[in-house]
């Protein structure tokens, strides 16, 4: 199975009754009733076109992209905690 890179976006709505219509643009991961937003995942290649389509709807207040693909997850100077090192050596 071939997997594609996906990117998340938060779509803020005026009313949650329109959340169901967003399924045709990607995978609806989460719907917040209190804050009225939907977390939507779509292919990375189609992010810009999907974002433009979503912003054209009357029920969409705002669309924000997830910055997770751009955040560095490997740290260069990550040092282990000294207290944890000694805990593992207690039994030896």
From Swiss-Prot:
One term under GO cellular component: cytoplasm
Keyword Lipid biosynthesis found: no
InterPro entries to which the protein is assigned, alphabetical: DUF2129
Location in or out of the cell: Cytoplasm
Keywords: Cytoplasm
Main location: cytoplasm
Sequence similarity: Belongs to the UPF0298 family.
HAMAP family: UPF0298
Name of the protein: UPF0298 protein BH2594
Annotated source species: Halalkalibacterium halodurans (strain ATCC BAA-125 / DSM 18197 / FERM 7344 / JCM 9153 / C-125) (Bacillus halodurans)
């Amino acid at each position: 199975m071939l997997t594609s890179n996906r990117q998340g976006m938060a779509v803020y709505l005026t009313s949650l009754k329109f959340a169901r219509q967003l399924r045709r643009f990607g995978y609806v991961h989460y719907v917040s009733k209190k804050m009225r937003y939907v977390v939507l995942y779509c292919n990375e290649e189609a992010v810009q076109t999907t974002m433009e389509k979503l912003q054209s709807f009357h029920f969409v207040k705002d669309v924000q992209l997830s910055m997770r693909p751009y955040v560095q997850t490997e740290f260069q100077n990550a040092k282990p905690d000294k207290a944890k090192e000694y805990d593992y050596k207690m039994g030896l």
